Amino acid sequence: MDTVQRVLFVDPSTGFYRLKRYPVGPHFGPVDLGLHLSDRHRSLNFGTGLFAGSILPGSNRLIFTGFSPCWRGFYISSMGGAGLVFDNLGINLVSLVGKASAPSVLYLNRTHGEEIEVEVHPLDLEAAWARGEGGVYGLMETVLARFRHRYESDPRILAVGPAARSTDFGAIGSAPIVKGQITAADTWAGRGGFGSKLLQEHGLAAIIYGGTFLDEDFRDRTVADGWFEEKYRKKLAAKDFEATTKYRFDPAFETGGTFGVNFATLKGRMLAFNGRSLGWSEAERLERHQHWVVDHYLRQFNEETIQTKSQSTCGEPCAALCKKTRDVFKKDYEPYQTLGPLCGIFDQRAAERLNRAGDAAGFDAISLGGVLAWLMECLVDSSLDPEDLGITRTPRWDPAAFRVVEDSAHNAELGLELIEAILHRRGGLDLSEGPRKWGRRLHRERGHRLLDTFLHTAHGRRGWMVPNQYWTPGVLAPMPIMGKYYMFYGPDFVPPRQLGRLNADRFVQELLMDNLGICRFHRGWAEEMLPEIVGSVYGLKDEYLKAIAVTASRINSRNASVFWESERDLDFVASYLARRRDVEKDPDPE
């Protein structure tokens, strides 16, 4: 195994590049090395962990790091499976420093040699975004058609959509390419707005990469099985199969994937209509969850996706089969929650249209859903008129008269209008510097406290993040990175100081996996075994754990979390506590 990490520095303004080696020990992976480079160069970095290409399941995530345009602090985002092709370049990390003078595509290829071909090509972005299905998908098709003939094996493409130009929460999208065709199992580095950073700060709309390099990856299954049998009395494959049950198929709930298991178990903890469900009685939440979610939204998913076994991986060999699909529509819990019930949508056809449009535009889907739901509530309570947003309709959010199919379709059409309004800044809807700044400007001009109904975590003066979709205080905790799972998000009540300790522990455990490029869906073994594996392969177990602790401390030293600034945030926590006391009968006096 290599004892150095190879970093390719690329300046998109000139096409100049250089390779630098960093020994394993001072830095172990794309997170701690990315933090070091971001601090020095304000770069956008992406790369893989030390075990990319190995037999360890979930080891091929592509990790992005840098200072986030929407969170306004150091951030980490990751993309499933995209590291498998990246490993064929024979490097560990790419660091972008500088900006192309026009929207461009970065071409990276390594064919039977020591040198990596690095080229920056200008791109007709409007034409690419208009091709085929449009946006991210059209851009991927354009780039593949232009460069496919130069690769001996299938490459991988990273692409952004119009949201990267118009907002601070544009995502980076990708999809496995099989036999020259782009598949439907698209994967995203969504949280953190790195698509906006890639285009606005570096002038790159797409990156295509691939190669033929074969390095010395860890492939000894006998050794790996020995580690797992000593710890779990099971071989690696058996333990991983057990650990990924939820994401494949959980017989306890007769469904699978994050969509299936989470929607089946939410019940009275469901979040709908921008969190207005917080004010419903428990009986109302249970009844509406049963009628709208279980009997319709979830039933459609189970019949169309689970029963037909329409599932795949993110592009790497994996037992989880977590990509649940129907045709081109990929079904994950949080996108289909924020661009679903949170927006008043409980029908798969309506949610598919809205999710696909958001993906094509290149938005972080979770943030988009939170913003759309907030704007819809502003229309419901007349804080804003349709003309203020350049749209023609208002939401249908009356739960007593709600028609699942018809009103879901109506609300989805409204969501599509709002997406166009955001992209083209209609009616003064300018989210280029985030919703907090836009909301404060309207407050000064009109006196409306629009941000009071925006459920979000705040960071510094402008930083923001739509929280993970679980009704628990941990998702609004003052942690240095929010919107991922770097905190405790379980349903149990935990006193504040203990919650802080649990959050810190989760932060360290998630860093431990991300810094080695391991998918968190495999955390059932990864959190325990990764330090042991680093120790066995590199002899640096204690050094790795220390490096993770130092990295967590360095990230936390920049923590600029702001106390909850919206009334909806306060309602979120207060109603959670009331439900724990009155419904869950939690006896804790705190």
Where are these regions (language model features)?
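Metabolite-binding pocket within alpha/beta catalytic cores that recognizes anionic/polar moieties
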Residues: M1, W71, Y75-A82, S367-M376
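Acidic/Gly/His-enriched mid-domain segments of enzyme catalytic cores or analogous surface patches
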Residues: L37-C70, P103-A175
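N-terminal short beta-loop-beta anion/metal-coordinating cradle
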Residues: V24, P30-S54, G315-L321
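N-terminal basic/disordered segments at the start of proteins
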Residues: M1-D39, N88
